[in-house]
Amino acid sequence: MITDPFDTGPTGTFRTLCQKYPDDTVYSGADGFRSLWGPIFYRGRANGTARLLVIGQDPAQTEAVTRRILSGQAGRRVQGFVEKLGFSKSYLMINAFVYGIYNQNMAVPHLNDPDIQAYRHKWLEAAFAPGKIEAVVTFGTPAFNAWSAFKATPAGQSVTPFHHKALHPTADKPGGPITRKDLLDNWNVALQSFHANIQHPDVTKPLAPYGNDFTAADLPEIPSLDFPMGLQSWMRTKDFWATMSPTPGTERANISIEVP
């Protein structure tokens, strides 16, 4: 008998935000967004209990299946990061964009379009309303810019969590300028900063920096508590089970799922 706990869904203001959200007139396919895939709102505790806020960029094909953000390769890397900080459940992850992107050059300039920004700020305001968030990590430049835009508002100025900007979890793309070691060196700096400033982790842990590459221990299973009921365990423990073709198309694309 499987007895996995599952995410029972957002509550309060978070639930309202999942009931009323921007449509494809805001996130237009012509602007580089996969609006036909639908919005993917969060992962973690959308119920006012989070103490760590994680901001990413946008959901991809794995997230389109699980309906939770940061659940693919990037998600498992981020899970390892937050668990190194001692957070096993008291975190909330949101993205700068609530819809996926098929063209970065077209979509990212819309980061602070009025309707996109206003909706994102509502999520951030809801996250801070209970008064429990004590630290914020932004992964990548769009996430950092989204946080900076919020901090310029009266609501953002009223909160003072510790913040650190880290590289995007998949910044070490093959053939790119950022190596795996560059990424992990950057994350080690972030770990040191957070370790000195976090007051209430779920579990107190000694600082355990990354080496030159990810180890199996650095890539933990994403907790079933973060997903809707019935999601299979292999979807939480494997990478690249949801893929697109080398030329996936624009707003419309086929997702191939390989069951291990």
Kindly label every feature range from the protein language model.
Residues 1-260:
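A polyanion-binding, active-site-adjacent surface
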